[in-house]
């Protein structure tokens, strides 16, 4: 049996995501094993371990998987803060790890830009997403005067915001208001007053909490700010549109392709049915993590961790449920197509694909 580790937030506030990823990976492994496994009949086994969404716990979980369970590779976590310290450990123990939604630059390279040879990811990075959003707002939506709203001290929010700002202004757009909140804030009216005074044609709302995004939208509308609100993958929740109670009607966010293809939707529905959970995008990452490792093991002709690492790095094109992944061997960052979602009533519906840039 070939063991694959899975570290994620299986308990705590965000366990919804971690468990969805685990179930996606388990179902993918079940399907692979039913079809004869890998390397002429070897079976796969998933060994999940709770990292609680905390860096220290995630590192301990990964070490345990390597030392006690002899895993050949690891999938997870979905947090950059956890994968950054895990990357150094992966290099030491020479076991490849694949972050799912860990989008900070430092997941695969250190502060000096040196590659972590054993750390990979399956999502686009903050700079890529920020650039895509800035370009789309300028080119496709015709926005020229934008407000930007980010969370102070939140790496993802500030990083996406920075690259979005750079892309939008490089095209000739103007950021007329640049406002921030603290992590725990739920009242955004002071910042919204400043934004409203500048009369932007769009507000970029880069927060990673659907309840806060909904609150922001409702407060903006109450204060007479009725322009387009636009977000990033931090808006990715089935709850957001309903929570916003109409305040996000016709608003957009850009994220991964998610459930917008029939294959992804069918798999999501199968996970939801099999494990009795709601359909969360993280289950697609679990699936694709397993299938990318299967692809790498088969190409390598070996389940040796070093051979798997080499094959992951040399991935020309991997067709997953979250879209087509093209690996950059120099950075271990994939370039991927993104999807635009538009709010109608209680849901965000797939609008269009933005091809990989």
Segments (PLM) and residue ranges:
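Sec-exported extracytoplasmic/periplasmic mature domains
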Residues: 12, 26, 30-37, 63-71, ...
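Extracytoplasmic ligand/sensor domains, especially the bilobed periplasmic-binding protein
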Residues: 71-179, 226-252
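Beta-alpha junction/loop-to-helix N-cap segments that form part of ligand/metal-binding clefts
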Residues: 16-23, 31, 35-109, 122, ...
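Short, surface-exposed alpha-helical segments at coil->helix boundaries
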Residues: 19-26, 131, 157-165, 261, ...
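Segments of small-molecule ligand-sensing domains
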Residues: 271-284, 294-349
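Short, low-complexity disordered leader/linker segments with a strong preference
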Residues: 1-3, 34, 355-357
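Extracytoplasmic "Venus flytrap"
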Residues: 2-26, 49-56, 78-79, 149-158, ...
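Extracellular/periplasmic periplasmic-binding protein-like sensory domains
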Residues: 217-287, 298, 342-356
């Amino acid at each position: 049996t070939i063991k694959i580790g899975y570290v994620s937030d299986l308990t705590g506030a965000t366990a919804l995501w971690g468990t969805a990823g685990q179930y996606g990976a388990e179902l993918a492994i079940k399907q692979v094993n039913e079809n004869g496994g890998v390397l002429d009949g070897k079976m796969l086994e998933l060994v999940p371990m709770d990292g609680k969404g905390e860096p220290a716990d995630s590192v301990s979980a990964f070490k345990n998987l390597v030392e006690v369970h002899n895993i050949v590779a690891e999938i997870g976590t979905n947090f950059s803060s956890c994968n950054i310290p895990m990357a150094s450990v992966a290099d030491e123990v020479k076991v490849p790890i694949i972050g799912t939604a860990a989008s900070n630059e430092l997941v695969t390279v250190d502060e000096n830009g040196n590659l972590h040879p054993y750390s990979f990811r399956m999502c686009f990075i903050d700079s890529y997403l920020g650039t895509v959003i800035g370009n789309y707002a300028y080119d496709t939506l015709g926005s020229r005067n934008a407000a930007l709203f980010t969370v102070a001290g939140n790496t993802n929010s500030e990083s996406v915001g920075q690259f979005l700002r750079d892309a939008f202004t490089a095209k000739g757009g103007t950021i007329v208001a640049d406002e921030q909140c603290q992590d725990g804030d739920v009242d955004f009216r002071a910042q919204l007053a400043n934004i409203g005074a500048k009369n932007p044609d769009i507000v970029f709302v880069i927060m990673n909490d659907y309840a806060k995004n909904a609150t922001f939208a409702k407060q903006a509308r109450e204060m007479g700010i009725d322009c387009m609100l636009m977000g990033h993958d931090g808006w990715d929740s089935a709850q957001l549109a309903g929570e916003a109670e109409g305040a996000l009607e016709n608003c957009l966010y850009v994220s991964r392709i998610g459930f917008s293809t029939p294959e992804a939707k069918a798999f999501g529905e199968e996970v939801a049915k099999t494990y009795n959970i709601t359909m969360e995008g993280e289950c697609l990452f679990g699936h694709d993590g397993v299938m990318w490792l299967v692809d790498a093991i088969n190409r390598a002709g070996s389940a040796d961790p070093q051979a798997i690492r080499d094959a992951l790095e040399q991935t020309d094109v991997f067709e997953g449920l979250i879209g087509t992944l093209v690996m950059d061997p120099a950075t271990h960052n994939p370039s991927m197509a993104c999807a635009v979602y538009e709010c109608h009533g209680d849901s965000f519906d797939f609008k269009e694909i933005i091809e990989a840039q």
